Amino acid sequence: MNKYLEHFRMSVADAVEYTKYFGIFSNEAELRGEEIGDGNINYIFRVVEDKTGKSVVLKQADKFLRSSGRPLDLDRSRIEAEILKLEGEYAPEFVPEIYRYDDIMCVIVMEDISEYKNLRKELMDGKIFNNFADEISSFLADTLLPTTDLVLDRGEKKDRVKAFINKELCDISECLVFTEPYVNDRNRNIVIPEACFHVA
């Protein structure tokens, strides 16, 4: 029986079963799974077959924010999958391969890039990456320029903007990331004393 015909938030066991049900691994494969997500929004699972070393990552969007339980549009998962596929066409050396997108379960099955470290954490720890400027500028040029009005037909550009817009996530970014660190009017930030003179 296919239990994946209606959206539900998956557990680690569900994620392992999912990879077998949809043929990512064989039914006989001995798998182990773990949740590896540490963010506020989505659930991320890693499924590994130790015998072969094959592994995949599943990223699932749920109807509610992981951190606060606030409702959030599931379409964000489709947008991310489609953006990653486009970026993979323009800059394949910098983007994990997308194996499958499931619009019912809102799951992206992708290449496991766990051997890489989290850049944000590494930079916060003061690590220096000698090739970072070259690599990030190559990625940005290769993915952003071809998607601008300078290159794309203006009708196609408008269609993409319409397909990729997510007002709820824009609101989160605009408020939590770009406004509230400086205007703490909702008192949702932890403002360290050294930064108080920067925050209204």
Task: For every predicted segment, state its role.
Residues R120-S138, T148-A200:
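ATP-dependent phospho-/nucleotidyl transfer catalytic cores
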Residues G88, L144-T148:
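Protein kinase-like catalytic domain
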Residues K54, Y116-R120:
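Short, charged/polar, Gly/Pro-enriched secondary-structure boundary elements
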Residues D102-D103, D112-I113, G155-K158:
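Short, well-ordered beta-to-alpha junction loops that form the rim of enzyme active sites
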Residues M1-C106:
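Conserved NTP-binding catalytic cores of kinases and kinase-like/nucleotidyltransferase enzymes
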Residues I108-Y116:
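Short pocket-lining segment of the protein kinase catalytic domain that shapes the ATP-binding cleft
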Residues E80-L84, A133-L144:
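Short, hydrophobic/amphipathic alpha-helical packing segments
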